[in-house]
Amino acid sequence: MVHFTAEEKAAITSLWGKMNVEEAGGEALGRLLVVYPWTQRFFDNFGNLSSPSAILGNPKVKAHGKKVLTSFEDAIKNMDNLKTTFAKLSELHCDKLHVDPENFRLLGNVMVIILATHFGKEFTPEVQAAWQKLVSAVAIALGHKYH
């Protein structure tokens, strides 16, 4: 289990409160699909993923990105119990969708980049460390069913 200090929790929640989940979620998933094109195989029903502009403009990518980032709200509310919080999603992604758990880590890293670009100077090294810790812990929780 990962322990978050009060300072880390504050750093995470302060930025989360300013986050445009719809915009950032679509951007994060879109960038994942562009930078790591093999991840596109999990989204066959999303239509045109033929180019970066097609991916970033795809309404299904944006909608699913929002859904993914919305699930991070559960992580923020349950930082001390991520394994239980993501147990059902872990099972879904492992047993039904067969998603490589490495993709969770990649998406987390993309999310940190999105945060840095959106928040600039507010995204201090301390804030980055707290968010990196959270996305890593979420990736581990999502990959738990695989072990």
From Swiss-Prot:
Q: Which domain of life is it from?
A: Eukaryota
Q: Name one GO biological process term.
A: hydrogen peroxide catabolic process
Q: Where is the Globin domain?
A: 3-147
Query: Is Iron-sulfur there in the keyword field?
Result: no
Molecular function via GO:
haptoglobin binding; heme binding; hemoglobin alpha binding; metal ion binding; organic acid binding; oxygen binding; oxygen carrier activity; peroxidase activity
State which tissues express it: Red blood cells.
Task: List GO terms (cellular component aspect).
Answer: blood microparticle; haptoglobin-hemoglobin complex; hemoglobin complex
**Got any disulfides in this one, which pairs?**
none
Q: Which UniProt keywords apply?
A: Heme, Iron, Metal-binding, Oxygen transport, Phosphoprotein, Transport
Q: Where does heme b bind?
A: H64, H93
Phosphoserine: which positions carry it? S14, S51
Its biological purpose = The epsilon chain is a beta-type chain of early mammalian embryonic hemoglobin.
Task: Give the PANTHER family listed for this entry.
Answer: HEMOGLOBIN FAMILY MEMBER, HEMOGLOBIN SUBUNIT EPSILON
Summarize the subunit comment: Heterotetramer of two alpha chains and two epsilon chains in early embryonic hemoglobin Gower-2; two zeta chains and two epsilon chains in early embryonic hemoglobin Gower-1.
Entry similarity comment: Belongs to the globin family.
Q: List the protein's name.
A: Hemoglobin subunit epsilon
Native species of this protein? Answer: Lagothrix lagotricha (Brown woolly monkey)
Q: What is the lineage of its organism?
A: Eukaryota, Metazoa, Chordata, Craniata, Vertebrata
